[in-house]
Amino acid sequence: WIMGHMVNAIAQIDEFVNLGANSIETDVSFDSSANPEYTYHGVPCDCGRTCTKWEHFNEFLKGLRKATTPGDSKYHEKLVLVVFDLKTGSLYDNQASDAGKKLAKSLLQNYWNNGNNGGRAYIVLSIPNLAHYKLIAGFKEALTSEGHPELMDKVGYDFSGNDDIGDVANAYKKAGVTGHVWQSDGITNCLLRGLDRVRKAVANRDSSNGYINKVYYWTVDKRQSTRDALDAGVDGIMTNYPDVVADVLNESAYKAKFRIASYDDNPWETFKN
């Protein structure tokens, strides 16, 4: 999965997919009542990027729905996965469940079109703080009470705080999650980070009793760091330059081993060689 980083304006969806992304990451900020409010990152952000592009969250969802609904004039067949980077740092821990409920209702109405031919992309809820694990139960509860528990089949999870792998496993246990797990590891492109924790995550993914289904690394903008991540065995690379990652995947060393995921590739299934 080539994951376009910080896609917060509707116009950027086309831009990143046209550069080669089959997945995008979008920032979600919350108001003081735990309502998802804007797709907005803010300053500071990655080096070489504008940090302040934004939409109202529900408007972004409508644009995203068009981009992922077959038959729509804005449809991109290639765009199959969306990571919502949930900026829950502004919330109290006891608001996490409410944030999950409100997020689910927004998605149900504006993205899934109340279950009636909505957007088809798989969704990853990326949570920065292990203490906010109740967001997951709140999300599930709202979809169930609104009569659409089946949409949970399209939803996966990520804890993005670079926590110890054992602590992450424990948070999922508390959240009652037993699958659909993406594990992120990374740092802003302004700084360097080694691949030690990525290798631990990949080892967990490939073990018989691990909790991880997929591993992605962020934010990778250079050819050499792309190669290093692929050599470590990641499933996804988040990047500001999807064309760079696409170019590396076309190199003979990687062409035989990797391909770009399509809609038919289940993002919740661990890939077995």
From Swiss-Prot:
Top-level taxon in the UniProt lineage: Eukaryota
Localization in the cell: Secreted
UniProt GO BP: killing of cells of another organism; lipid catabolic process
Any one GO cellular component localisation term in the record: extracellular region
Main location: secreted
Disulphide linkage map: 45-51, 47-190
Taxonomic source organism: Loxosceles arizonica
Keywords: Cytolysis, Dermonecrotic toxin, Disulfide bond, Glycoprotein, Hemolysis, Lipid degradation, Lipid metabolism, Lyase, Magnesium, Metal-binding, Secreted, Toxin
Function: Dermonecrotic toxins cleave the phosphodiester linkage between the phosphate and headgroup of certain phospholipids (sphingolipid and lysolipid substrates), forming an alcohol (often choline) and a cyclic phosphate. This toxin acts on sphingomyelin (SM). It may also act on ceramide phosphoethanolamine (CPE), lysophosphatidylcholine (LPC) and lysophosphatidylethanolamine (LPE), but not on lysophosphatidylserine (LPS), and lysophosphatidylglycerol (LPG). It acts by transphosphatidylation, releasing exclusively cyclic phosphate products as second products.
Annotated protein name in UniProt: Dermonecrotic toxin LarSicTox-alphaIB1aii
Tissue specificity of this protein: Expressed by the venom gland.
Binding site for Mg(2+): 25, 27, 85
